[in-house]
Amino acid sequence: MPTISLGTIPMEHGLAVAGILFCLGLVGLMVRRNILFVLMSLEVMMNASALAFIVAGARWAQPDGQVMFILVISLAAAEASIGLAILLQLYRRFHTLDIDAASEMRG
């Protein structure tokens, strides 16, 4: 039985997937009015950039891509926690998750 070597994917394919994910997240960010879907679109965009860092770091065998990945994941976690806190406050005050309702907020 022959051995199958899986190797790594070409850099162009990895960057293409990252670009497609980023574009999908950008479309979701511009089209949706629900703040939960906007946060999810931001997460997809951040993960796409993290994937691009990993692919580029693997191509040149440098650990910089992995370091940037850890930074992006840390920023994504902070963004998710702050975004969900804003989402909860928006829902408690206006009983809706519509972004346009946030323009009525006064502080």
Curated annotation (Swiss-Prot):
This is NADH-quinone oxidoreductase subunit K. Keywords: Cell inner membrane, Cell membrane, Membrane, NAD, Quinone, Translocase, Transmembrane, Transmembrane helix, Transport, Ubiquinone. Its main location: membrane. GO terms for cellular component: NADH dehydrogenase complex; plasma membrane. InterPro entries: NADH_UbQ_OxRdtase_chain4L/K (IPR001133), NUOK/Mnh_C1-like (IPR039428). The lineage of its organism: Bacteria, Pseudomonadati, Pseudomonadota, Gammaproteobacteria, Pseudomonadales. It comes from the Bacteria. The gene is nuoK. The keyword Protein transport does not apply. NDH-1 shuttles electrons from NADH, via FMN and iron-sulfur (Fe-S) centers, to quinones in the respiratory chain. The immediate electron acceptor for the enzyme in this species is believed to be ubiquinone. Couples the redox reaction to proton translocation (for every two electrons transferred, four hydrogen ions are translocated across the cytoplasmic membrane), and thus conserves the redox energy in a proton gradient. It is a multi-pass membrane protein. It comes from Pseudomonas fluorescens (strain ATCC BAA-477 / NRRL B-23932 / Pf-5). Belongs to the complex I subunit 4L family. NDH-1 is composed of 13 different subunits. Subunits NuoA, H, J, K, L, M, N constitute the membrane sector of the complex. It catalyses: a quinone + NADH + 5 H(+)(in) = a quinol + NAD(+) + 4 H(+)(out). It is found in: Cell inner membrane. Its EC number is 7.1.1.-.
